[in-house]
Amino acid sequence: MADYHFGEVENKWQSKWNAEKTFKALENSSKPKYFVLDMFPYPSGSGLHVGHPLGYIASDIMARYKRIKGYNVLHPMGFDSFGLPAEQYAVQTGQHPAITTEQNIARYIEQLNKIGFSFDWDREIRTSDPAYYKWTQWIFIQLFNHWYNKASDKAEPITNLVKQFETAGNAGINAACDEDAVTFTAADWKSYSEKQQSDTLLKYRLTYLSETMVNWCPGLGTVLANEEVKDGLSERGGFPVERKKMKQWSMRITAYADRLLKGLDTIDWPEAMKEMQRYWIGKSLGAMLTFKVVDKDMELTVFTTRIDTTFGVTYVSIAPEHEWIGALTSPEQKAAVEEYVTKAKNRSERDRMSDVKTVSGCFTGSYVTNPFNNEKIPVWIADYVLAGYGTGVVMAVPSSDERDYKFASFYKLPIISVQEGAHTDITKEDFDPKAGTMINSGFLNGLTVKQAIPEAIKFIEEKKIGFAKINFKMRDSIFGRQRYWGEPIPVSYKNDIPYVLNESELPLALPAIDEYKPTETGEPPLARNKAFADKGYELSTMPGWAGSSWYFMRYMDPQNKTAVAAADKINYWGQVDLYMGGAEHATGHLLYSRFWNKFLFDMGITPNDEPFAKLINQGMIQGVSKFAYRINGTNKFVSAGLKKEYDTTPIHVDVSIVHNDVLDTEAFKKWRPDFASAEFILENNTYVCGSEVEKMSKSKFNVVNPDDIVNKYGADTLRMYEMFLGPLEQSKPWNTNGIEGVYKFLNRFWRLFHDTAGNFAVSDAQPTAEELKVLHKTLKRVEEDIERFSFNTPVSTFMICVNELGSLKCNKRTILEPLTIALSPLAPHIAEELWSLLGHTTSVSTATYPAWDEKFLVESNHEYPISINGKMRAKLNLPVDMPAAEVEQQVLANEVVQKWLEGKAPKKIIVIPNKIVNVVM
């Protein structure tokens, strides 16, 4: 067969890989290990579109490449099958999430296998599998049973803390704990009731129960994390979100804030990703300072990084959720305050932090005294102040902070300059808040900012009105969800005291319920299972990020029934060497998994403080939406080039009925009933659609199913084409303009091994120097590009190589066999088939990447461009060692040059060896 029949070949090798477990990873290997992992998908109902496999293809290329480079590769796949996405799909389809999840996973596996990934399916995990979430629950219990000792800078058993309480109280204990934890003696501790002791320990445990301001989404019936809310709406579904106080389980991630920051310096991640985490963690060095409330027995405490600017404080702003709002509000301001607070509660903290344009606030009617100059200043409520950051109170210095300046200007509050010199004018673009020297600042006058800060801290500590402090912007993570489809939290209650289950009681299985939809009241759906609720179990479930915070470790030993994974296997596989996934997980999964890993490191379960050594964020393959333009008030559609002549509305059109921007009008009429009677105003007898690059989405009808591409062109074409679209990290629009080129390349590669009659015909003759040069040049470039994770350039390199070998009519085994190995990571199916035809009985994945030799890359000739009076007129291929005088002779003897010389002698000939020749007339 002269042509390559991809369907037959791909089915053959996919079946063979599966039957023979070709990619099964074993620990008993003398080879160096390489653990390559994709962020596992949540199995949505829509299956994969062509954007999803981008990262999977890249990681699979690296996995296959590392195998042929002599590594023992672990390349697993699983499913993040608990959580909101799976449950929302079930709600929409009216089916139980257990059923839809199973169906969706089967569909995903079918699609993934069609693309030819080298996954070790024996290690597949699912977060909704009780055998898996038993260990998610176990980790929760360990977190509950540990506290963070700042002195040793690690988590320690809570039993150690209890012993200290029993002997000396909590004096001198340096712990990560709630801000409101009170000091007590050993006698106090012993006098506490069991409930009081439990409540006290909750203030220290790494997972704890407390009254917390949360993002409540009635539409989803659950609490959402800050990163799940955008512009006051849930990112999933677009439902309104409000702020309210609820009793919730939380994770004390803030205990690890400093280590999470420091760890970023030890891992090979994109710098932009590290910066996102640094910003989210938000470490700042500053001071705590108290302001006495005028005419009230109250004090407001602020955290500030600029204690040196206190003389410039002209008002204090307080978070809308602050518990003292009521006490601070005067009768005259009550109505205005209540209205403002209600409005502010409808915005998430994330939106309030990022919105720097909107100025809004409300005066409480109260005043405080500035402790540096005894001036009376007003207390305002402002939604840019967050209750969970610092103390929920901010001292405002309009002359030194742009947000304070905008607020003060808008509400006509005083602005006192406390710095002078270059770059100290806040109204100018070159403003630098740390420039100049202090003015209007009493004992700080004349000092630089750097000098003034320690002096100001010394002052507040001597006056006992404050002290130096390190603060973090990151808050503890809400851990409970009022939804059904998640891990049950392994806690039961007795006399209002939470007790974690014994390990022997795990897994606490998710019980079946008839009605699993969320309630708008906040009562968890598990309350509907009377038998479960009557046992006193916690009715909230874990969030979607619980199971994904440690799954990478379970792949090392997925069948283990007695531990997260066996110690020898964890020690063998170690860190994930390459982690592939989207940048959208920066402040969610990628932060939580680092937190849990550090905790498991403290427990001695993993020898690695960081889970992912290298991270690559693949870009997004975007959809190219197509539009038809309907004339308003009619069912008539005008072609894109004529739409300016009419009043139109763009309508998304299914991309499958558009070819090269031309709409199949008959297919359009059949597409939807409301378009059956559509009429068209054409240009040049065709209807031309408009185009726009957007996120690939079913609602935009721009989704391209990879199955369709595989069926038409083959999996190897899809794999190579997705890489060929551009650099892996960049986003790019999907288009099929170049896919035919990749398809034809694979057929040309196939034909190198076959004669014109279609028979396999590979010669054992010795290769020429030119053939060896093509081979070794290709091997070198492909190896170097894959090593630096540049997967688009090897596709071009192979295309050039095949064209050159085709021109040389090369069919020699010495050349084609190494090329087959080198191509196998990108196009494994055709490589396996050709490897087999070459006489090998083992998989090409067991071969060794061929070594390239520099001696074959040495150029013996150079092609000189010949310029006459600055214009290139000819090219001459000459030996690289030819002397300049001989080069001149060859140039003058050239027919093209002679024509341009017109019988005249040149004034000068300039030869730049192995570069260019200039002839000056």
From Swiss-Prot:
Binding site residues for ATP: K698
Keywords: Aminoacyl-tRNA synthetase, ATP-binding, Cytoplasm, Ligase, Nucleotide-binding, Protein biosynthesis
The protein's Enzyme Commission number: 6.1.1.4
Name of the top EC class for this enzyme: ligase
GO MF annotation terms: aminoacyl-tRNA deacylase activity; ATP binding; leucine-tRNA ligase activity
GO biological process: leucyl-tRNA aminoacylation
Motif ('KMSKS' region): 695-699
UniProt subcellular location: Cytoplasm
Source taxon at top rank: Bacteria
Motif ('HIGH' region): 41-52
GO cellular component: cytosol
Catalytic activity: tRNA(Leu) + L-leucine + ATP = L-leucyl-tRNA(Leu) + AMP + diphosphate
Family, as annotated: Belongs to the class-I aminoacyl-tRNA synthetase family.
NCBIfam families cross-referenced by the UniProt entry: leuS_bact
Protein name as it appears in the record: Leucine--tRNA ligase
Species this chain originates from: Cytophaga hutchinsonii (strain ATCC 33406 / DSM 1761 / CIP 103989 / NBRC 15051 / NCIMB 9469 / D465)
Gene label: leuS
